[in-house]
Amino acid sequence: MNLLSFDHVLKNPQDYVSEIYTYGFQDVADGRHIFRNIQPRGYHDDFAKFVSKLFPDYKIELNFVRRSPLNQEEPNFIHSDEMMGDITCILYLNEMAPVEDGTTIYDEDKNPLFVIYSKFNRMIAFDSNVFHSRNIFENFGYEESARLIQVIFLKYKK
């Protein structure tokens, strides 16, 4: 398993988050699952540019922001993103989050290996076939204080 973590990813993260909130969020159906509070992003936003430079041998398959307020119903908890790509990148976008917020990484038997804590403007990247979950099952906050992350799935260029 490979895992990377970078702090201070975006040059102007407060402006970036403000811009996200100007566009709003939507629910996206994927088969029998509904992913709530999603904002699709393009291939050229600041996070996508950072990730593309960091991983030049990969292409962006999907780029979106997700807002997850307290008690929002989610389609999964412990899961892998194997069907989405080869590398999963998560950018934490809350200036103020509960100290326990972040991502837990699991082994193949879904036993916790380690916990990564969120920090505003921190990115983590890991192999998409790795089991992981948000640290706080029920999410947190409301409206602009709700959990806010950006996710990019990368696929190896063949």
Regions found by a protein language model. Give the residues of each.
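Non-heme Fe(II)/2-oxoglutarate
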Residues: M1-N76
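Catalytic core of non-heme Fe(II) oxygenases with the double-stranded beta-helix
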Residues: L70-K158
